[in-house]
Amino acid sequence: MIFGRHSVLKRGCSTWNPQQVPQAEFQARLDAVRQEMGRRNLDALVIYGDNYSFADLCYLTNYFPKVRGGIAVVPRDGAISLLLNIGSRDVPFAKTLTWVDDVRASNQVGGDGAKLLKEKGFDKAKIGLADSGQGFPLPQLEEMKSSLPQVAWQDCHSMIQPQRLVKTAQELSAMREAGGVLKEVCDGARDFIRPGRKEYEIVADIDRLARDKGAEDIRILTGEKRLNPPSFKQAANIGDHWAVYLAVQHERYWAEAGRTFILANDAKLKDAYTRAQEIITAMANQLKPGGAVAAIDEIAQRELGEFYATASVYGLANGIGLNQWEAPFLNEDDARQVGAASVGATTLNEHMTLALRVIFETEGKLVLFGDSFEVTASGAKSLLQDK
């Protein structure tokens, strides 16, 4: 799979627009989760999230950690509480990002989490633990469990993910917003990418443009022969072409794209880039309700031919949403690389969202094209539209 260096600190714009994703949206999600809790006979659910893997936590609360992590305590009945690894002075800001009223600061989420569960009367309960990113620091997790010796714990790491597969109208609107920001960044990057400029200068310009457009986070990989994460050591001047992978998080949701900028009159390179776009179109033609996820891979294999082995190393497709990489995945290996428990759905449904990408080499030069799509009744629809 394709990996960008993730931020230790999310330093981009952080807001919540209740008109775009209103509280009623979260209530519907909460009702569905509680229905599943009832089916599993759970009294409460503890959801962990951090700044790398926050999708399940955010799905119910709209909150995403900018540094470190936190938990949501979700009773089967009653109010949700958020316990976040932040300072008390940061609580007022955290409350602007969530509809949850009970937001608390903690520097020891495990121990304080146990106290919170006891406070709510769950010291002898059946409690589910959802930590799909497996990021809960082990010492803190062990402290929480050891402080509640009479609790019956149940792993629920994959419990919420199936509910996130099909996006609601509000989610799709948010993803189109993210796609619109990403399109502006892709278009604006053309002005920065010129022969003779140093790589780190261009990356800094792209990063600043994304932040100016309201991005919460951005992943950038670039290169002529291989994709590299940003580094001040990338002091070389770019040559006659540059491949750029971009993913932007905006209002919690991700959109992804890949572009190859050709700076010289190289007919073979231009033909290869055109071919990459044609292959993505062929793959996107498989994005129909009721279609098999595996068909995307089959078409890619047929269209890429000898380039398939190289392209598949980077990953050809995956779901996208609150996670940069989420179900459905094409195969178990792709899922395992990003820590997912399974490939997820094997059949496409309307309003699923996927990122498609093709990366291969021709005459020692990297060619990249990718886009993010919604599955609609009339076929694939790009999320990268003008705002």
List the model feature ranges, each with a label.
Residues 1-387:
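Active-site neighborhoods and metal-handling regions in enzymes and metal-associated proteins
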